[in-house]
Design a protein with these regions (language model features):
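Intrinsically disordered, flexible peripheral segments
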Residues: 1-182
Length: 182
């Protein structure tokens, strides 16, 4: 089952699409790209600290596999909007051209620009995850709001991710907890 919804993040001028799918490949897709043509994953879920996982720390794939054992895994895929995709591709290709022609100063500036563009994507992704945990999904737990253990994997620099930048947010549904009222 795949559900798709468009999400607009108020105040960020950034939209995107969020697809919810169920992991059926034993994490092969994210692991195949992690540490090869994309960066490692990042722990992002609000329940992570309760399991000894520092928010923002790199995901150790072996730890993820161990924690995921016996859990249904949801993949909340945040997809960049067309305007961010076009800007990202333009700067990425210019940076590669500068690098390949030996213009390291220009390449460095463009890589910084690319990081700034991609930080918008991460900001939108975090906002969507916070919203979704606040809303909660009944399939994860009847208690709402919720906190999830999430391993987020960005796909935006490999041939696979460059054409349509996105972030895989792998939710270990068995570890869902009710949020503490504030």
């Amino acid at each position: 089952m795949t559900a798709i919804t468009a999400i607009a993040i108020t105040g960020m001028d950034l939209t995107g699409a969020l697809r919810i799918t169920w992991v059926r490949d034993n994490l092969a897709h994210v692991e195949d790209h992690s540490h090869t043509d994309e960066t490692s994953g990042t722990w992002t879920g609000l329940a992570c600290p309760g399991y000894g996982l520092a928010l923002g720390a790199d995901v150790d794939n072996a730890v993820l596999r161990d924690m995921a054992a016996g859990s249904e895994l949801a993949d909340l895929i945040w997809e960049a909007p067309d305007v961010l995709t076009a800007e990202h591709a333009q700067v990425f290709l210019a940076a590669m051209r500068a690098y390949n022609t030996g213009d390291s100063e220009r390449a460095d500036r463009l890589w910084e620009d690319l990081r700034a563009i991609w930080s918008k994507a991460w900001s939108a992704n975090y906002a969507v995850l916070e919203f979704m945990q606040g809303t909660g999904l009944t399939r994860f737990s009847p208690v709402k709001p919720q906190q999830w253990v999430i391993a987020s994997f960005e796909h935006h620099t490999s041939p696979h991710g460059l054409s349509h930048p996105h972030i895989h947010n792998i939710v270990l549904t068995a570890l869902t907890i009710g949020a503490i009222a504030r």
